[in-house]
Amino acid sequence: MSNHKDIWLQCETIIYSQVTLKEKMQAICNLLGSQMPAYDWVGFYLSDVKNKKLYLGPFYGEPTEHTSISYGKGVCGQAAEAQKTFVIDDVAEEKNYIACSIHVKSEIVVPIIKNEIVVGQIDIDSHTPAAFKQEDQQMLEKICRELAIYIE
């Protein structure tokens, strides 16, 4: 299994590199998707705060039809509305789940918060049940805190 500290250091290098926000996000998706075995789909959603919608940004993995999600809908929408991380160990048990693939067993969604407003989020799906541990959550929350600096 990949070392979370090593992955964080690589993400930190990406975050502070002199490239666009979109390029930073794509590089993070690619890194996490290729280096974290249980991360089968990694994507960023950016918020349209006025209209309370999330729009798909850079991602790694299979294309998804969920390119727009309203606040409150699914795990992503709930995380945006509640402004907190959601870890779902078994998506089959989640009442407000929007299925992306029959293979997805667990999910983590971490909001990107700037000035007390959700400006985006990272969403990760896994084909492994209960794939996301505390160290995953801590690393992803750190990534989102640092990325928030670069979101207008």
Regions found by a protein language model. Give the residues of each.
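Intrinsically disordered, low-complexity terminal regulatory regions
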Residues: 1-63
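Juxtadomain coupling helices with adjacent low-complexity linkers
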Residues: 12, 126-152
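Short loop/turn motifs at secondary-structure junctions and domain boundaries
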Residues: 36, 99-104
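Short hydrophobic/aromatic beta-strand element in the GNAT-like acyltransferase core
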Residues: 41, 109, 121
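Regulatory sensory and allosteric helical modules in signal-transduction proteins
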Residues: 47-53, 57-99
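A short, aliphatic-rich beta-strand micro-motif
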Residues: 106-113
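Sensory-domain boundary capping and coupling elements
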Residues: 113-126
